Amino acid sequence: MDKEKLIAPNQMGYLILKDDGNLLDSGGDLKNDDRSANVIMGLLNLTDSIDEDFMPNSSCERITIDYDQHYYSICMSNRRIYVVKLSKTHTQNGATTSSSSSTSYNDAAEGNNISSSTVLA
């Protein structure tokens, strides 16, 4: 995976989408993964249809999709959708570890800076 796009030691892959769902960049497990991009866009479109009476004054800032071995962190900034697939554990010197990290993705082409905090248990 491109070292400039690696935002966490436990990162498995990433997608960068335009707000209309078109794939701009990808890497790792998500390299050219149009299917995942379509599923994520469907999920984001679903969040737009939440009844205001059910959740007044709420806006979704980040979505996390949690699986046993990994999770996806999805956020939007400057009309771009950033998706990162992260392993719940990673190995260092052959030992499986848990970690707490703060991550930042810099999109040099657009001057965007996406940050998130991750705690792994």
Curated annotation (Swiss-Prot):
InterPro entries xref list: LAMTOR4 (IPR034601)
Among the GO molecular function terms of this UniProt record, one is: guanyl-nucleotide exchange factor activity
Primary localisation category: other
Localization terms from the record: Lysosome
Q: List GO BP terms, alphabetically.
A: cellular response to amino acid stimulus; positive regulation of TOR signaling; protein localization to lysosome; regulation of cell size
- Give me the ranges of the annotated region Disordered: 91-121
Keywords assigned by UniProt, alphabetized: Lysosome
For whether the record's keyword set contains DNA-binding, the answer is no
Residue ranges with Polar residues bias: 112-121
GO terms for cellular component:
lysosome; Ragulator complex
List the transmembrane segments: none
Write the signal peptide boundaries: none
User: Record keywords: GTP-binding included?
Assistant: no
Query: Can you tell which superkingdom this protein's organism belongs to?
Result: Eukaryota
Q: Which PANTHER family match?
A: RAGULATOR COMPLEX PROTEIN LAMTOR4
What role does it play?
Regulator of the TOR pathway, a signaling cascade that promotes cell growth in response to growth factors, energy levels, and amino acids. As part of the Ragulator complex, may activate the TOR signaling cascade in response to amino acids.
Q: How does it assemble?
A: Part of the Ragulator complex.
Annotated family: Belongs to the LAMTOR4 family.
- Name this polypeptide is given: Ragulator complex protein LAMTOR4 homolog
